[in-house]
Amino acid sequence: MSISDNSREELGELPAGRPLQSEFNDDLDYPRLGSVTFRRGTLTENQQTMWNEKWPELGRVLEDELIDIDAWFGRTGAKTIVEIGSGTGTSTAAMAPLEADTNIIAVELYKPGLAKLMGAVVRGGIDNIRMVRGDGIEVLNRMFADGSLDGVRIFFPDPWPKARHNKRRIIQSGPLNLIAKKLKPGGVLHVATDHADYAEWINELVEVEPLLEYKGWPWPECPQLTDRQVITKFEGKGLDKDHTINEYLWQKKQ
């Protein structure tokens, strides 16, 4: 049964209240959102007009149905990369024109962030970006078949800095295993953070998933674009505080 219905009166809206969460029974650690609900926000009048016109073509919301990637993008055989937590889409929109042969699917909870990305897509005539509104773990688990993705990107995820909230971090054993299952052999996971404690956390996990081979950073032979092209809003804030950007690359074993 579908969690969402894109035909609802307000396009791209998610159910109110606490989001549904999958039950994982593999003894791995998965983030739990706890009291966090789907982030809501107000669009400008122009953004709302654009959203109403373009969302049926460019967007979907979290649902229990696998995405037919070829049908959605109107082409077959193209590589597909999912970006989890795309924010306002600064990197997404900057990278996509340089990888026109690749389908880019941006996953984000925050509606104004997706609207901003949609504006960049429309203004720039970018035709290889689509959007899914929902929690990244649930979207991966419910909407993509195993072995269907060429890449997953997670740029500057929420660090959940308080120790009692560390279990909500997306980079941990469970998500790494889930991502590995969704990647094709040879597929790439690219993570970036400017949070020192989160970087230490990730450093302890780089070898935890047996399906992934850690390649470090940089990895000149990486088969995908790794230059994020621009400094994102959150990256800029970190650099202003003299934070170090740490990046990580893994490849699914053949």
Curated annotation (Swiss-Prot):
Biological or metabolic pathway of the protein: tRNA modification; N(7)-methylguanine-tRNA biosynthesis
NCBIfam families xrefs: tRNA (guanosine(46)-N7)-methyltransferase TrmB (TIGR00091)
Task performed by this protein: Catalyzes the formation of N(7)-methylguanine at position 46 (m7G46) in tRNA.
Gene Ontology cellular-component terms listed: tRNA methyltransferase complex
Sequence ranges of Basic and acidic residues compositional bias: 1-11
UniProt keyword Glycoprotein, yes or no: no
Binding site for substrate: K162, D194, T232, K233, F234, E235
Active-site residues from the entry: D158
Catalysed reactions, as listed in the record: guanosine(46) in tRNA + S-adenosyl-L-methionine = N(7)-methylguanosine(46) in tRNA + S-adenosyl-L-homocysteine
Protein name: tRNA (guanine-N(7)-)-methyltransferase
Annotated S-S bridges: none
Annotated segments matching region Interaction with RNA: 164-169
E.C. no: 2.1.1.33
Assigned protein family: Belongs to the class I-like SAM-binding methyltransferase superfamily. TrmB family.
Gene Ontology MF terms in the entry: tRNA (guanine(46)-N7)-methyltransferase activity
Originating organism: Corynebacterium efficiens (strain DSM 44549 / YS-314 / AJ 12310 / JCM 11189 / NBRC 100395)
Superkingdom per UniProt: Bacteria
This protein's encoding gene: trmB
